[in-house]
């Protein structure tokens, strides 16, 4: 798969280059996707339980980098950062898709909305990567999450308040109806061999808790931007200002 080529093939190539040019520090941005549908508040000690090729290849790449570090542990530093879902200005990932649906008034809340979603603002992730350059030798593994977590009701309400000055969530539909629509979409995908924007797995992911913890606080790192500030900056940049000519980035 493309993930095998990029994550596993990329890890092999990077380790070869590090060997060739005597580079002793590697920072790898992995993902909390290695944990799959993890229990709430899963930390760095959580067991790998990935459910797709993205999570699998991120985890297998981690093992490749660990093997590289193990060859010369007294001199080599490996930093593995496992971010949760990342958002920010110009980022075209899953959070942007949600923001865009709400902005275009095409969003329906499925389920109670009481499930929590850990998120990470891109500026903070970049700041932590820079901060980690000073870590010593060894293997350093961190989840990256900006706290406190929003539940879906609060997240959607905050977005609608900023975009429409409305202090509500909008239309809700029960979970069983949402899942039924997802299974119908799965069947249509099989019949017509064409991926649809909705699926049972996407609805399950949307309505499940995706809440992680991190030991980053122990490293002394302080995020430069709060989660709510990052969300407000992103909404303003994407929907309240004219930034159509600015660069955009497509991510998983």
Predicted regions and their residues:
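Mid/C-terminal beta-alpha module of Rossmann-like enzyme folds, strongest
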Residues: 132-197, 225-235, 242-252
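Active-site loop of classical SDR/Rossmann-like NAD(P)-dependent oxidoreductases
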Residues: 152, 197-214
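Active-site beta-alpha turn of Rossmann-fold NAD(P)-dependent dehydrogenases/reductases
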Residues: 27-31, 82-84, 145
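Flexible, glycine-rich beta-alpha linker
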Residues: 35-36, 76-97
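Active-site Tyr-X1-5-Lys
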Residues: 51-79
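Conserved Rossmann-fold NAD(P)-dependent oxidoreductase catalytic core, especially the SDR/UDP-sugar
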Residues: 12-54
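Substrate-positioning beta->alpha
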Residues: 13, 91-97, 110-133, 140, ...
